[in-house]
Amino acid sequence: LDLLQDIFGVITRAHGYCSNRAHLYKAEDTISACFFFENGLPGSGSWCFVGHKSAKEDCIEVIGEKGMLSFSVYNYDPIQLVTSEGRTSIVVPNPPYVQLPIIRSVIEHLQGIGTCTCTSVSATPVNWVLDRILGKL
C-alpha cells in the first residue's frame, strides 16, 4: 500500500473485510479491500497468507484507458506492459542489497551525518489505511 500511495497519491477512503481462516496465529490471514486515492482513482486488493502454494500470486495490475501494466512486489518478474500495440516485457535486475539504502539512511541518521526520511509521520497514511481495512477505525 505504501508503494501504491507513492505512485498514485494518498488513499483517502478505505474499507475491507478480513478473517483468520487458518487459525495459525491471532492476526488476520485473509483480507479483501477497496480504496480510493485522493485523485479519485479506485483500487482494490486481496491478500491470502495461508493459501496453497499453487495459488500463490504476487501481482499488481494497473488498468487504464490505454492499456495495462502489471508487476510483482516481492518477486523480480519482468514488468508487463500491454497496450493496443502489443505486449512488452521490461526486465529490472534484482538489486544485490535491496535493504541497503534504508539501513544506510538509519545508520547515518543515528550517527548525526544524515537524515532518515522514513519517520512515524511518513508511515501514518499507510497505517491509517491498514487500520481502516482491518476495521480498527
Segments (PLM) and residue ranges:
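Active-site loop of classical SDR/Rossmann-like NAD(P)-dependent oxidoreductases
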Residues: 93-104, 118
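C-terminal helix-rich "cap/oligomerization" subdomain common to oxidoreductases
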Residues: 38, 105-137
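Hydrophobic/aromatic residues within well-ordered alpha-helical segments
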Residues: 7, 98-102, 126
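Contiguous beta-strand/loop segments that form the cofactor/metal-binding neighborhood of enzyme cores
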Residues: 1-76, 103-113
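Generic detection of short hydrophobic beta-strand segments and adjacent strand-loop junctions
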Residues: 88-92
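Short acidic, glycine-rich loop/turn motifs
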Residues: 35-39, 81-86
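A generic "alpha-helical surface" signal
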Residues: 2, 97, 121-124
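Short secondary-structure transition/capping segments
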Residues: 26, 82-84, 129-131
